[in-house]
Amino acid sequence: MNKVTLLHEGKAKKVWQTDNPDLIIQEFKDDATAFNNKKKGSIADKGVTNNAIASRLFTMLGENGIPTHFVGKLNDRDMLCKKLDILLIEVVTRNIAAGSLVRRYGFKEGTVLSKPIVELYLKNDELDDPLMNEDHAVALGLGTCEEVAHLKAMAKKINSLLVPWFAERKLRLVDFKLEFGRHKGEILLGDEISPDTCRFWDAESGEKLDKDRFRLDLGGVEDAYSEVKRRVLEQ
């Protein structure tokens, strides 16, 4: 499968059109950003690590009935995917209080939530990806009521699969962001699942093993990503 035209270059990936109009290639980069591109840097081999992690997780989710855009891992940095009409809705699922949930509502960091919280954000960097509800999403023309409800239901199902899967690998899934898109009339999970889009804490030590190490200048970013990769690829 060949890269024909660069369709889009984002913060973490390049998206290429292939010679098949229904398929694209996601090329994972080493670039790192935080706070909606206000902080920039690079993490050695991040693209290779995230491609490996996301490929494994998409495979697992597909085996458990979650429709995704994943077709296959082509090489260290490239992932073959179905071409999606991306929905401009970011779906964040939270199991443990951290990040903006702590800042907005006064939760103590590390509080285990009585039930997962599913939040919707408008995918718009210029507006700093504002939090919104289902009515906003429908009013903005981002999807129908049924589609937005379906996204939240899919996020809950994905969470129910990921939490125990990571727990077996001694990782706590604190929270994570999902993106979806339409492909031939079906809504599929897209983008990636990786330490760029999830918060992972070591189940025993509580050590942060995700992009918070970059955001908060904690150091050891490459080692944290590599450790998540090692555990994810364990059989």
Swiss-Prot record:
Protein name: Phosphoribosylaminoimidazole-succinocarboxamide synthase
CDD domains, A to Z: SAICAR_synt_PurC (cd01415)
Pathway: Purine metabolism; IMP biosynthesis via de novo pathway; 5-amino-1-(5-phospho-D-ribosyl)imidazole-4-carboxamide from 5-amino-1-(5-phospho-D-ribosyl)imidazole-4-carboxylate: step 1/2
Catalytic activity: 5-amino-1-(5-phospho-D-ribosyl)imidazole-4-carboxylate + L-aspartate + ATP = (2S)-2-[5-amino-1-(5-phospho-beta-D-ribosyl)imidazole-4-carboxamido]succinate + ADP + phosphate + 2 H(+)
Recorded superkingdom: Bacteria
Underlying gene: purC
EC identifiers of the protein: 6.3.2.6
UniProt cross-references to PANTHER family, sorted A to Z: MULTIFUNCTIONAL PROTEIN ADE2, SI:DKEY-6E2.2
Family assignment from sequence similarity: Belongs to the SAICAR synthetase family.
A biological-process GO annotation: cobalamin biosynthetic process
InterPro entries: SAICAR_synt/ADE2_N (IPR028923), SAICAR_synt_PurC (IPR033934), SAICAR_synth (IPR001636), SAICAR_synthetase (IPR050089), SAICAR_synthetase_CS (IPR018236)
Any Pfam family the entry gives: SAICAR_synt
Entry's Gene Ontology molecular function annotations: ATP binding; phosphoribosylaminoimidazolesuccinocarboxamide synthase activity
Keywords associated with the record: ATP-binding, Ligase, Nucleotide-binding, Purine biosynthesis
HAMAP family recorded: SAICAR_synth
Keyword Nucleotide-binding listed: yes
Lineage, highest ranks first: Bacteria, Pseudomonadati, Chlorobiota, Chlorobiia, Chlorobiales
